[in-house]
Amino acid sequence: MNNILIITGPTASGKSKISMKIAQDNNGIIVNCDSKQIYREIPIITDQPNLNDTSVEHKLYGYVSVTQQYSVGLWIEDLKDEISSIIQQKKFPVITGGSGMYINSLIYGLSQIPKIEDSVRNETRRLFKTLGKKEFYALLIDKDPIAKCLHKNNSHQLLRAYEVIEQTGISIFVWKENAPREPIFKNFKLCILMPPRSEIYKKINERFINMINTSVIEEIENLLSLNIPAHFPAMKAHGVPEIIQYLQNKISIDQAIEIAQKNTRNYAKRQYTWFKHQFRNALFYESQDQLLESIKNSYVYYN
């Protein structure tokens, strides 16, 4: 029996809306698997659900500070605790979100890379800050030629690859390929919502305009006031870099909107390709109605 439902898909595909519908109808609780919606201080820019809405209970949203060093491994532990609690309550767990790394780890399990010592992690970040992206990237490639596949601007992945090769002497890609992995849960059904791209692009554009019309500028001002390092995940949430540039008088608000919309659309485009090739046993749906119809007889709900 499948008694855990996972709903994923590109950004702005309607995951949250369909998850709410399913949870409302079936005594469910929604659990977050979006790597940016975990952060407490940025609910608007990350489009977090309204946690004051008592019609459906939400878990793992806005519960981590942007100043905290958090990882997919910590999220997995938090997730397992929440799912265990939900099942004990005889309620229906609906896991939803679109972060590729979180979904991949949930479905296939975590790579068993040794824990990185604090001294190695701190030295890696010191080097990154001292050398800058370009020279740090060159240093990484010299130590780990396989890491050349990483994008030069993906600070998080560059730092992670460097600290792994520095501590273990083995490329992070070798660890990931050779280490045995097991799914976190075995009793799940994975549904991927993939509406036409034109629909998603339209929603992305509209969503960012709606954010600008709320207090998102103030939210990012407060984020900046915390003085957290630029490589921290929250600083790279969609729209954050562009609004920061606006606040620093480097671009206009119209330019910030246009660039953020374009970057988010490009991200959604990459997500389409990634989801199509990543999960062999997933079920794909073009619309929310298709997904709803498909799962009607697939679960024993706890009503």
UniProtKB/Swiss-Prot annotation:
SUPFAM superfamilies the UniProt entry points to: P-loop containing nucleoside triphosphate hydrolases (SSF52540)
Domain of life, source organism: Bacteria
EC number(s) given by UniProt: 2.5.1.75
Binding site for substrate: 11-16
Pfam family, one: IPPT
GO biological process: tRNA modification
Keywords: ATP-binding, Magnesium, Nucleotide-binding, Transferase, tRNA processing
Catalyzed reactions: adenosine(37) in tRNA + dimethylallyl diphosphate = N(6)-dimethylallyladenosine(37) in tRNA + diphosphate
NCBIfam families linked to this entry: miaA
Name of protein: tRNA dimethylallyltransferase
Species whose genome carries this gene: Ehrlichia chaffeensis (strain ATCC CRL-10679 / Arkansas)
The encoding gene: miaA
